[in-house]
């Protein structure tokens, strides 16, 4: 249990004090005992909504603890905060901005915010027009050839979200007039770009410069490199930049200054946080892959969760439950690391996406009022595709000394839809899907129940190094199938989970000041490494020593 809870005043009616009392009474209860005490536990601790099923029966909670967690949420005025989120309030207090990513998935006919909805759909329609043109083979490069490769240049929210979704929904790739491939480049060292450019033809390649500020050095350095690559092959003509670059940013003037024509500029707004931006024109690579209908289904799934989040009681509200269970594990059971374990290879990049969403949002130590936080905030979030993880770090989960909470996720159905091109192999592939599902269930069962999950005869003479303690809590999210709609739902669940936890911790989840200063210090060091400046006197001894090695002034 977080020691900071001891700092709270001893008001016996305080939800925190009541929960602390429950910890003292229930901390030694094993998950297997919770199931023994409550035969209907699976039914009582699970929620079905639309295409999602959420099972949290393997969490170390009781009915009484859940009631107290809900009371804590109410005490923190969660309902009022949800209402503020879904308004035009500037709840991003440190930057004096709204946080209206939810507006990006409003249906076009939504009447509550007509002007806002119109703004959003105007930009989406401009994106859809470009998508249709590229898909039809009508968008041509400087030499008149049809574009067949599109490279998204971005970093952080301009890369992680679009990359994750594009990979996850590759089965839903639409047919185009000519084959179209979408690629992603993010690293500032040029390694990804170097490998990729060898595979591409300048005449048929289009680049998306995706940067909210249009000032991110990682992105602009890659953009400048590909510009030189294009101009070397096609000549330094205005039509090269005009035909081979599309920009996505809040800064139209910066895109124009760089050379991107207005027709190729897609806009978003300051109230769209980078890690919440895949629903906007930052999602251009997604729409290029799964088509306009697919992209609209992605938005519709997220909007369905927005409605669920706003209109469902906390006791049956999936993102609220996910958040409160995380609070329970982190702040009361002292479980400060959380693993994300999808049992579907298409969700390969989901854990990396969640790392930014959760840790950049809630990795804070200062409250909204400027005071230090009273509770530990975001746990370490990590993970991997489940079957691969079983051969990497499950040893630690099962028999290590660290307490870890886990989210398992899997689709119920796979390899049975008309759009799959490998129907002739469906029977064997369905068996492989069942193999993945059986492993997903087996691992969550063993983590929860430990030796109880083993055969009694086997356990009788089992040496201690082969035994399992169990009691590692987990939730399981099942999707009817992995499609644009259900993936939109899944992502929005985690967005709102993050928001709920920020309310409990009283922090601002929509800024990222911890990211900014490192970039500024890098800007100060770059002239030294480039030989333009040589004054190292203001630097610490370690940084001075490393710079001298990098410049070849001393041996490493």
Swiss-Prot record:
GO BP annotations listed: gluconeogenesis; glucose 6-phosphate metabolic process; glycolytic process
Cross-referenced InterPro entries: G6P_Isomerase, G6P_Isomerase_C, Phosphoglucose_isomerase_CS, SIS_dom_sf, SIS_PGI_1, SIS_PGI_2
Involved pathway(s): Carbohydrate biosynthesis; gluconeogenesis; Carbohydrate degradation; glycolysis; D-glyceraldehyde 3-phosphate and glycerone phosphate from D-glucose: step 2/4
Subcellular location: Cytoplasm
Enzyme Commission no: 5.3.1.9
Enzyme class: isomerase
Entry keywords, A to Z: Cytoplasm, Gluconeogenesis, Glycolysis, Isomerase
Catalytic activity as recorded in UniProt: alpha-D-glucose 6-phosphate = beta-D-fructose 6-phosphate
Protein name: Glucose-6-phosphate isomerase
Taxonomy of the source species: Bacteria, Pseudomonadati, Pseudomonadota, Gammaproteobacteria, Moraxellales
